Amino acid sequence: IYTLSLHDALPISSLRSAAVKALVDTLKIRSDGVNLFQAEAKRRKITIDDLLQIARGLAAEERPRLKMTGSIYRFAKKASDSEMRDLAHAALHEEHETVRALLLKPFGLKTTWRRPFPLDISPLMEYAWSENTLLAESAIDCLEAFKDKRIHDLAVQLLERKGLGSFALALLIRNYRKIDDDLIAGLIGKSGVIPHHVQQDIREIYCRHRSADALPILLHTYRRGECAFCRHYIVRAMHRCGGVPMKILKECLYDCYDETRDFAKRLIKRSSIHSEGDGMNVRQLS
C-alpha cells in the first residue's frame, strides 16, 4: 500500500534517484513483511490463551469490545462445542471484570454465529447487576438467548431499579408478558429521546408479541426515536398490535427510508379508510 502510493506520488525523474529507489524498495519489503505476517495470523487458529492475552491487553483501552471483535470472530468461527465450553469456564474464573466481559462476548445473541452460553446462567444473572457497565452489558447479551422465568424477573427488577440504561429491556424480547406493558410505558414516557438500543428492543418485543396496549409505547418511540431503520419496524409493530393511525401513515409517505414509504403506501391502498379518517387506525391486515 505504501509502495504504490509513494510510487504514484513521486515524479518519474525522482524515481531514477538511487536514494529514492532504495527508500521505495525498503518500504516494499516492509509492506510485504506486514502482509505476510497478517496472512499467517489469519491462517493460524486462535486459542483461548490468545483471547485471554488479547483481552488483558485491551482491558484498559477505550471501546475494547469493538477492538476485540476480529479475534472473537476468528475464534468462534472454528471453535468446537468443547472449546466454547472451555472459554465459558475461563470467563467465569477470570477475576478482572473487563477481561471477563470480553471473554463472554462470543456468547452474545447479537453475534452472527449464535453460540449460546453453554453453562449454568446463574453467574450471568449476577453479572447483570455489576457496576462494571461492560460486564453487565455482556451478561445481558448472553442472557438474551434464553427464555426463562428467572430472566423475566431479572429484567423487571433491573428496569425498576436502573431504568432503560440497564439494557435489561432486551431480556423481554423472549421473556415478555403482557403485564410488562405498564412498566415499559412508564419508562418510555420519561424518555425525551429514545436511544437506538431501546428502539431496537421495543421493535423486537412488539413485532414478536402482539399487545393492544402497546400503541402508546410505539407512538412515543416512533416520535422520539433517532433511527430511521428502527422506525420502519416500529410502524410494523403498530400494525401488528392493532393498527397504525392514518396520521402516522401519511407522515410515513415522506419518510427518509424507502421501505417505510412503501409499507405505508400498501396499507393505505389496501385499507378502506381514506384521508378523512385522520383520527382512526388502519385495520389489521393479513
Regions found by a protein language model. Name each.
Residues 169-231, 235:
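Alpha-helical adaptor scaffolds
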Residues 35-42, 54-56, 73, 87-89:
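Charge-biased C-terminal accessory regions appended to nucleic-acid-, cytoskeletal NTPase
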Residues 245-286:
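Eukaryotic acidic, Ser/Thr-rich intrinsically disordered low-complexity regions
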Residues 26, 30, 40-44, 75-79, ...:
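Residue-level signature of the C-terminal ends
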Residues 4, 14-18, 26-36, 46-50, ...:
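Generic helix N-cap/helix-start motif at coil->alpha-helix transitions
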Residues 1-8:
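Single conserved hydrophobic/aromatic residue that forms the stacking wall/gate
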Residues 23, 51-55, 84-89, 121-125, ...:
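Buried hydrophobic core positions in alpha-solenoid tandem helical repeats
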